[in-house]
Amino acid sequence: MDNTFNISVILPLHSSKIRDFDEFFNKAITSITTQKVLPKEVVIVHTDEESLVGYLNSFNFENLNVKKVLYKGEPNYSSQINLGVKEASSEWISFFEFDDEYSQIWFNNVKKYSEIYPDVESFLPIVIDVNDKSVFAGFTNEATFAANFAQEMGLLTNDMLHNYQNFQTAGMAIKKKVIEDFGGFKSSIKLTFVYEFLLRMTYNSVKMMTIPKLGYKHINMRPDSLFWDYKFGPDKISEQEVKFWVSTAKKEYFFTDDRNIKYTESV
């Protein structure tokens, strides 16, 4: 029995100097090595930070096929993910974060569901959100099964996204060809780049399905994380700017390319 699936895990890293990095990273990688079905490869897109490079070179990835890709330039989550997708050699892609964890059955479920539903081009996990102390904070992606949102149970649609925004791409499986055809994350869009991506995929008739099982654990608002900085850090975003980026996502998903959007005061 083949215990691998034709999927590349894309893991962007910008620094090993983040608080509790070693603990988070070990748990994240362990959540991959203990999968019932292993991914074909893990693509780590990292900066040239000396301590990070040294850490990765000495880390024991056990049974994983790891490809390390150097990202040159200012660290940027969207751009690093996009580079990882470009360098990936698999049919499927999964976006991962160093402080998150896959459930042990996730890739096994994706493999099974992809065989049962060959027309589906992306599978979303039910995400359990926790804080940095592992205290439960809620679920994400479960709304595709809500009768007041879902037109067809389990499927994410463009109309649904216009009515409800709480969906995320962390842990998802999506065909590489879909990203090649309709574009990756847009690095110029702050805060709502995930929302814009999902709007764009569904607008282009990409069939996206949530697998009704817990598939991913996500640390929500970890101190010093990207979205924590948007709310509390030096890059704090005002309520007016939040409205701007939500409005921008709803306008930009018609375009495949990143049009280098800049924040302006009026919406």
Predicted features and spans:
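Glycine-rich, basic loop-to-helix element that forms the pyrophosphate-binding segment
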Residues: 71-88
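Acidic donor-binding loop at a coil-to-helix junction in glycosyltransferase catalytic cores
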Residues: 190-197
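Short, flexible, basic/aromatic active-site loop/helix in glycosyltransferases
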Residues: 141-164
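Short, acidic, metal-binding catalytic loop of nucleotide-sugar glycosyltransferases
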Residues: 27-39
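Short aromatic/hydrophobic "clamp" motif used to bind/position activated sugar donors
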Residues: 93
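Short beta-strand/loop segment that forms part of the nucleotide-sugar
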Residues: 39-49, 69-71
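Conserved donor NDP-sugar-binding/catalytic core segment of glycosyltransferases
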Residues: 105-142
